Protein backbone atom coordinates (compact mmCIF):
# COMPACT_ATOMS: atom_id res chain seq x y z
CA UNK A 1 0.00 0.00 0.00
CA UNK A 2 2.84 2.42 0.80
CA UNK A 3 4.48 1.93 -2.62
CA UNK A 4 1.21 2.64 -4.40
CA UNK A 5 0.74 5.75 -2.25
CA UNK A 6 4.13 7.10 -3.28
CA UNK A 7 3.30 6.62 -6.95
CA UNK A 8 -0.05 8.42 -6.88
CA UNK A 9 0.25 11.92 -8.29
CA UNK A 10 -3.40 12.96 -8.42
CA UNK A 11 -4.90 11.47 -5.29
CA UNK A 12 -7.13 8.53 -4.74
CA UNK A 13 -8.96 6.53 -2.10
CA UNK A 14 -8.51 3.19 -0.40
CA UNK A 15 -11.55 1.52 1.15
CA UNK A 16 -10.87 -1.35 3.54
CA UNK A 17 -13.61 -3.87 4.29
CA UNK A 18 -14.05 -4.21 8.05
CA UNK A 19 -17.18 -5.20 10.00
CA UNK A 20 -19.32 -4.14 12.92
CA UNK A 21 -17.81 -7.20 14.61
CA UNK A 22 -14.56 -5.21 14.74
CA UNK A 23 -16.31 -2.36 16.54
CA UNK A 24 -18.29 -4.17 19.22
CA UNK A 25 -16.81 -7.66 19.41
CA UNK A 26 -18.47 -11.03 19.09
CA UNK A 27 -18.81 -13.67 21.77
CA UNK A 28 -19.46 -16.33 19.12
CA UNK A 29 -16.48 -15.55 16.88
CA UNK A 30 -13.75 -13.61 18.72
CA UNK A 31 -11.10 -14.26 16.06
CA UNK A 32 -13.28 -12.64 13.40
CA UNK A 33 -13.69 -9.60 15.66
CA UNK A 34 -9.94 -9.54 16.24
CA UNK A 35 -9.13 -9.44 12.54
CA UNK A 36 -11.80 -6.86 11.69
CA UNK A 37 -10.72 -4.69 14.61
CA UNK A 38 -7.20 -4.89 13.18
CA UNK A 39 -8.49 -3.69 9.81
CA UNK A 40 -10.17 -0.75 11.55
CA UNK A 41 -7.00 0.38 13.32
CA UNK A 42 -4.82 -0.31 10.28
CA UNK A 43 -7.12 2.00 8.29
CA UNK A 44 -6.69 4.81 10.81
CA UNK A 45 -2.92 4.32 10.99
CA UNK A 46 -2.51 4.29 7.21
CA UNK A 47 -4.67 7.41 6.88
CA UNK A 48 -2.50 9.27 9.40
CA UNK A 49 0.74 8.09 7.82
CA UNK A 50 -0.33 9.03 4.29
CA UNK A 51 -1.55 12.46 5.42
CA UNK A 52 1.66 13.13 7.37
CA UNK A 53 3.76 12.24 4.33
CA UNK A 54 1.65 14.40 2.04
CA UNK A 55 0.27 11.53 -0.03
CA UNK A 56 -3.00 12.49 -1.64
CA UNK A 57 -4.68 9.23 -0.71
CA UNK A 58 -7.60 8.95 1.66
CA UNK A 59 -7.95 5.69 3.61
CA UNK A 60 -11.31 4.74 5.08
CA UNK A 61 -13.13 1.58 6.07
CA UNK A 62 -16.65 0.27 5.75
CA UNK A 63 -18.31 -1.72 8.54
CA UNK A 64 -21.22 -3.89 7.37
CA UNK A 65 -23.76 -5.42 9.69
CA UNK A 66 -25.25 -8.81 8.83
CA UNK A 67 -25.45 -9.09 5.03
CA UNK A 68 -27.35 -11.69 3.01
CA UNK A 69 -24.46 -13.48 1.30
CA UNK A 70 -23.03 -16.99 1.13
CA UNK A 71 -20.78 -16.07 4.06
CA UNK A 72 -23.81 -14.87 6.01
CA UNK A 73 -25.60 -18.14 5.29
CA UNK A 74 -22.59 -20.11 6.54
CA UNK A 75 -22.66 -18.04 9.72
CA UNK A 76 -26.34 -18.86 10.26
CA UNK A 77 -25.62 -22.59 9.83
CA UNK A 78 -22.72 -22.39 12.29
CA UNK A 79 -24.77 -20.48 14.86
CA UNK A 80 -27.65 -22.93 14.50
CA UNK A 81 -25.21 -25.72 15.36
CA UNK A 82 -23.90 -23.77 18.36
CA UNK A 83 -27.47 -23.37 19.57
CA UNK A 84 -28.10 -27.11 19.11
CA UNK A 85 -30.80 -26.57 16.49
CA UNK A 86 -31.14 -27.36 12.81
CA UNK A 87 -33.49 -24.44 12.22
CA UNK A 88 -31.27 -22.10 10.20
CA UNK A 89 -34.29 -19.99 9.20
CA UNK A 90 -35.04 -19.31 12.87
CA UNK A 91 -31.45 -18.17 13.41
CA UNK A 92 -31.68 -15.92 10.33
CA UNK A 93 -34.91 -14.44 11.70
CA UNK A 94 -33.25 -13.79 15.07
CA UNK A 95 -30.48 -11.91 13.24
CA UNK A 96 -33.01 -9.89 11.25
CA UNK A 97 -34.77 -8.85 14.45
CA UNK A 98 -31.53 -7.44 15.90
CA UNK A 99 -31.48 -4.79 13.14
CA UNK A 100 -33.76 -1.85 14.05
CA UNK A 101 -34.34 -1.16 10.36
CA UNK A 102 -36.16 -4.52 10.21
CA UNK A 103 -34.14 -6.40 7.61
CA UNK A 104 -30.74 -7.85 6.89
CA UNK A 105 -28.46 -5.97 4.55
CA UNK A 106 -27.87 -6.84 0.92
CA UNK A 107 -24.57 -6.53 -0.96
CA UNK A 108 -25.86 -3.44 -2.79
CA UNK A 109 -26.14 -1.61 0.55
CA UNK A 110 -22.42 -2.08 1.09
CA UNK A 111 -21.51 -1.37 -2.54
CA UNK A 112 -23.18 2.06 -2.31
CA UNK A 113 -21.16 2.86 0.81
CA UNK A 114 -17.94 1.82 -0.90
CA UNK A 115 -18.79 3.95 -3.94
CA UNK A 116 -19.32 6.93 -1.65
CA UNK A 117 -16.00 6.43 0.15
CA UNK A 118 -14.17 6.02 -3.16
CA UNK A 119 -15.78 9.10 -4.70
CA UNK A 120 -14.94 12.79 -4.45
CA UNK A 121 -18.14 13.21 -2.41
CA UNK A 122 -16.12 11.99 0.58
CA UNK A 123 -13.07 14.14 -0.21
CA UNK A 124 -12.80 15.40 3.39
CA UNK A 125 -12.89 11.93 4.95
CA UNK A 126 -9.82 9.94 5.90
CA UNK A 127 -9.27 7.51 8.74
CA UNK A 128 -13.03 7.14 9.11
CA UNK A 129 -15.26 4.12 9.34
CA UNK A 130 -18.62 4.12 7.58
CA UNK A 131 -21.03 1.88 9.49
CA UNK A 132 -23.72 0.34 7.26
CA UNK A 133 -25.58 -1.93 9.66
CA UNK A 134 -29.29 -1.15 9.71
CA UNK A 135 -28.92 0.43 13.15
CA UNK A 136 -27.39 -2.67 14.77
CA UNK A 137 -24.64 -0.77 16.62
CA UNK A 138 -26.94 2.14 17.54
CA UNK A 139 -28.52 -0.02 20.25
Each language-model region and where it sits:
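Short, small/polar-rich loop/turn modules that mediate ligand/substrate recognition or access, typified
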Residues: 56-58, 125-127
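Conserved loop-to-helix N-cap of the C-terminal "lid" that shapes the substrate pocket in Rossmann-like
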Residues: 61, 88-92, 101-111, 135
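Active-site helix of classical SDR
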Residues: 35, 43
